[in-house]
Regions:
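Metal-dependent phosphoester/phosphodiester hydrolase catalytic core
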Residues: 1-222
Length: 222
């Protein structure tokens, strides 16, 4: 669905009744954008449907998140002191493939968001997303003066899978591609000044498929 969905207000109310999120619509502009903390970690929950331009509408400036939501996010990220700042989105963000409902099909807004993150010198960014019916970890580092941003795309556990090879995604780490039913677990450990994120991906029977560790100190500007 997109911003034209005539029942989006009803859908928002149903979401609030079903999910026990601590907050919704923190931007005050509609939708279910939210935020929560877990220990010393911050999670920013974005709504990529409520303000979305139709996939087939190219007659106007296109948006997936909307300027108000992005500007709130940049401000909230700038305030955060968390070693890892998890940005949770319904669709793939860092992938360079302009396919399906990826953020790359909204190139101007995607560029605006990523540029704002870099301009504000926000550290510790990790994107969490899905809706691709396969799993892959992407890593974007434009040059040696910036730290690498990661994007964990993880799906599906119960819906259909596909055989997409993500060959169009120049940031994709190919050995992390999973085309079977799977799920992930994130674990953050270590002392306050040296936190480490461990990503583990399992098949539907609980067998580990791959693991990757990322140090918070490696997600900082030099």
């Amino acid at each position: 669905s997109d911003g034209s969905f005539w029942l989006k207000e009803t859908a928002s109310e149903i979401f609030k009744l079903f999910w026990g999120n601590p907050n919704y619509d923190v931007t005050g502009n509609g939708g279910i954008t939210g935020f929560f903390q877990w220990g010393d970690l911050d999670f920013f929950l974005l709504d990529n449907r409520y303000h979305r331009t139709s996939n087939n509408n190219f007659t106007e400036p296109r948006q997936m998140l909307g300027r108000d939501q992005i500007d709130w996010l940049i401000n909230a990220l700038s305030f955060s002191q968390a070693p890892f700042k998890f940005i949770v989105v319904g669709g793939q963000v860092l992938s360079t493939g302009a396919v399906y409902e990826n953020y790359s099909t909204y190139p101007e807004e995607r560029k605006y968001l990523l540029n704002k993150i870099r301009e504000a010198k926000i550290e510790g960014i990790v994107f969490l997303d899905g809706d691709r019916h396969h799993t892959i970890l992407s890593k974007m580092q434009e040059n040696e003066n910036v730290y690498p941003m990661y994007d964990l795309t993880c799906s599906p556990l119960t819906s259909g899978t596909n055989n997409d090879d993500e060959s169009y995604n120049s940031y994709g780490i190919k050995e992390t591609l999973v085309n079977i039913h799977n799920f992930g677990i994130l674990n953050v450990s270590g002392p306050a000044k040296n936190r480490e994120l461990t990503i583990e991906i399992f098949d539907k029977d609980g067998e580990e498929l791959w693991t990757k560790s990322i140090k918070a100190n490696d997600l900082k500007y030099k």
